[in-house]
Amino acid sequence: MAQVLRGTVTDFPGFDERADAETLRKAMKGLGTDEESILTLLTSRSNAQRQEISAAFKTLFGRDLLDDLKSELTGKFEKLIVALMKPSRLYDAYELKHALKGAGTNEKVLTEIIASRTPEELRAIKQVYEEEYGSSLEDDVVGDTSGYYQRMLVVLLQANRDPDAGIDEAQVEQDAQALFQAGELKWGTDEEKFITIFGTRSVSHLRKVFDKYMTISGFQIEETIDRETSGNLEQLLLAVVKSIRSIPAYLAETLYYAMKGAGTDDHTLIRVMVSRSEIDLFNIRKEFRKNFATSLYSMIKGDTSGDYKKALLLLCGEDD
């Protein structure tokens, strides 16, 4: 049975964009800022509603809501609120653009987004990227990456994964054998084989291939990837396998490692919490609880502070 996906943020009932715009203006007018009002309001409205509030704010006060928020807020809290205000359909494209911009490339962001988005989502991201930035996402990725890592990203960006249909057992067997021969049984590794199979076969087919692979080789496919590849390609192949197995579980793990140990990767924490809040954050929470000895809520609570913490906990919903 397919998992029913649900977010933690939904449309606010009895929504009134003008009243909300007035609340926000009041929170920022005069001396000091009422952060509590801002975070409570914005985390309880859907992204579409936030865009309506923004429009009402301009109509009522002739001011840009985002500019006002940026000038009143600071630090990680500001970054989180700015992310919440970005139109959903632009958010992934914006994150990818920033991962590709400037001196270094942020491969972590490229890997996470491109590996965990569905073909439909990737097609939408490519279109928005081109409209917003006047260049093709694929061209920008090619210009900023290299080798097999680049090739795998390009294959995924084609968004031509087979649709889920009936399982062809013979094809499952053939792909599992091909992967075994391309990795464990070969001196060196035939990366092309991994890229083609991982990048084009359907999700249900690949899940069967991973099971069959275990039967044939005695290894989980992740163990083979770990042994046979390295660097960015290894990270990307692992992200693809984990996303094929379960996108919420992969993103739960991403959140866990963003907070585990010394220091917090706030960029990742904000990106996943915001981008999934209306899609599958509820499922991510459940996977988090299942796979780690704690809940997402309590980990955020122990790892963050101040208004930033309050806003993240409201996005998270309740403790599991």
UniProtKB/Swiss-Prot annotation:
Keywords: Acetylation, Annexin, Blood coagulation, Calcium, Calcium/phospholipid-binding, Hemostasis, Isopeptide bond, Phosphoprotein, Repeat, S-nitrosylation, Ubl conjugation. There is a cross-link at K29 (Glycyl lysine isopeptide (Lys-Gly) (interchain with G-Cter in SUMO1)). The modification N-acetylalanine is found at A2. GO terms for molecular function: calcium ion binding; calcium-dependent phospholipid binding; phosphatidylserine binding; phospholipase inhibitor activity; phospholipid binding. The modification N6-succinyllysine is found at K290. Belongs to the annexin family. The [IL]-x-C-x-x-[DE] motif is a proposed target motif for cysteine S-nitrosylation mediated by the iNOS-S100A8/A9 transnitrosylase complex. This is Annexin A5. It comes from Homo sapiens (Human).
